[in-house]
């Protein structure tokens, strides 16, 4: 007997904002979404700040969004957790940090600090780096090197020079720390097995290979002069003495796992085969658990378990579920949706559609959405699933490029695909929910007219198709309880979200 599916469609990076000449969402032709908003119950959801477990005013992101959606509760995030530890002093007692620094003192080796150098708060925060430098000073370390991964996505594309200067000033103030390398996140924080990029980052940090410039601020300025912004700055070696060597200690201060895995594995995994290199031992600290299978690492802030999230609960009830996305968002509908657990639950199937191999997604704003859509429709029509969780990556990934015309095309692509998935769901007698995890494509320009590549704090939509009812405004944590509500299932007690359906 065919199942009647409840399908959750997550339009990654699709926020709500007034029409403007930089709003790709309103500039796009969206006949499907226009029709859905007109015909079905809809509301708005908060996807940022305190409502998703982030500091007040902090923009949401895909990891946080999917964790809250899948958890059915506000999940306290790593950024405020670590920041609070700095405030209360427990940060400086952290076992993994202390082990890394004590090993340097015992062996006479160097401490390397690396991560995304910005205050964007998505992958890291510069204040956490400053706290590590303070800790290194307090412990009397002298050989401390910083490898700066420039951002340009979660903050302005040319803010990196200012962050590098700020770091230099902090090092001078503390009397500890030297910048060893500078490079764009494009190289050091790949997540799509583009090993040629990762190797450039590795070679700069380990072998001292790449461009050379003894002044890190000037190095970034020179890149700007060549028309290359923060994200894409090619690796520059600043201090040739700052290469990573045998028995050195490394603290990777990024707390978001997905873009931290590849460069970490290249250093710590003896069986790594992404490119040719020789393995050597280090004391390596991952700020959070990047991957449960990662060998030879310490974890500074182990993940707090999200028990009885939607995936686990559906499985315990004997329900079947499908998770489907292209590469760029596959971890989000699986690992993050399951609360940071790699485990695949009984009854949970997964479909990964490869993302296109292009340098930047403005070159192919459709990405792999049509393939994701077709595979999803096929699975819906199979009648095999009670719940389907689907992500369309386009509005976010193309929004990050800052190219407005491409973002418009991305929105239009998603609109077409949403229509097909909703139609297939309704034809099976099911219910479709259309929402987003955070904003991005609705705000493509900075006030000065330069490209806006970061996420936003705007509200996101929630449309309930196939069930005529009244909805209240809410937050991402309310989606899972709403799914359970339309399925006639009680919420587990661990979920503190509430159904969006007005009773």
Question: Where are the model-predicted features located?
Answer:
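Feature captures the catalytic ectodomains and active-site-proximal regions of enzymes
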Residues: 1-503
């Amino acid at each position: 007997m065919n199942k009647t599916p409840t399908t959750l469609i997550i339009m990654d990076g699709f926020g709500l904002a007034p029409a403007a000449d930089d709003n790709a969402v309103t500039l796009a032709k969206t006949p499907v979404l226009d029709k859905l908003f007109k015909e079905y119950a809809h509301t708005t959801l908060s996807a940022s700040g305190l409502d998703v477990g982030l500091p007040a005013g902090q923009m949401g992101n895909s990891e946080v969004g999917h964790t809250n959606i899948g958890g059915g509760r506000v999940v306290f995030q790593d950024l405020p957790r670590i920041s609070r530890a700095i405030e209360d002093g427990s940060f400086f007692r952290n076992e993994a940090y202390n082990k890394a620094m004590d090993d340097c003192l015992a062996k006479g080796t160097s401490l390397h600090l690396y991560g995304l150098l910005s205050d964007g708060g998505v992958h890291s925060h510069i204040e956490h780096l400053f706290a590590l430098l303070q800790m290194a000073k307090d412990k009397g370390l002298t050989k401390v090197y910083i490898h700066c991964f420039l951002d340009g996505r979660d903050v302005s594309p040319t803010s990196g020079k200012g962050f590098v200067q700020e770091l230099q000033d902090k090092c001078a103030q503390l009397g500890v720390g030297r910048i060893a390398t500078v490079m764009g996140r494009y190289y050091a924080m790949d997540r799509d097995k583009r090993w040629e990029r990762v190797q450039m980052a590795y070679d700069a940090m380990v072998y001292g290979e790449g461009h050379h410039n003894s002044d890190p601020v000037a190095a970034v300025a020179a890149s700007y002069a060549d028309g290359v912004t923060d994200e894409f700055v090619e690796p520059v070696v600043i201090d040739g003495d700052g290469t990573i060597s045998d028995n050195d200690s490394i603290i990777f201060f990024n707390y978001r796992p997905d873009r931290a895995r590849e460069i970490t594995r290249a250093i710590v995994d003896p069986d790594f085969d992404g490119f040719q290199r020789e393995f050597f031992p280090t004391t390596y600290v991952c700020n959070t658990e990047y991957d449960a299978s990662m060998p030879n690492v310490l974890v500074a802030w182990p993940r707090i378990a999200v028990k009885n999230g939607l995936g686990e609960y559906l499985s315990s009830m004997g329900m079947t579920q499908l998770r489907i996305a292209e590469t760029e968002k596959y971890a989000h509908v699986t690992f993050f949706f399951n609360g940071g657990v790699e485990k695949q639950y009984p009854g949970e199937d997964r479909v990964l559609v490869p993302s296109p191999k292009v340098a930047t997604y403005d070159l192919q704003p459709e990405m792999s959405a049509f393939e994701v859509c077709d595979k999803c429709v096929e699975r819906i029509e199979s009648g095999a699933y009670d719940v389907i969780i689907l992500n369309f990556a386009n509005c976010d990934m193309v929004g990050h490029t800052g190219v407005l015309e491409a973002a418009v095309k991305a929105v239009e692509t998603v609109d077409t695909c949403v229509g097909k998935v909703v139609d297939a769901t309704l034809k099976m007698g099911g219910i479709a929910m259309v929402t987003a995890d955070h904003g991005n494509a609705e705000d493509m320009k900075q006030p000065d007219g330069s490209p806006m590549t970061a996420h936003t704090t705007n509200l996101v939509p929630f449309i309930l198709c196939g069930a005529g009812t009244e909805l209240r405004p809410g937050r991402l944590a309310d989606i899972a309880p709403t799914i359970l509500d339309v399925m006639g299932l009680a919420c587990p007690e661990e979920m503190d979200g509430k159904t969006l359906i007005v009773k």
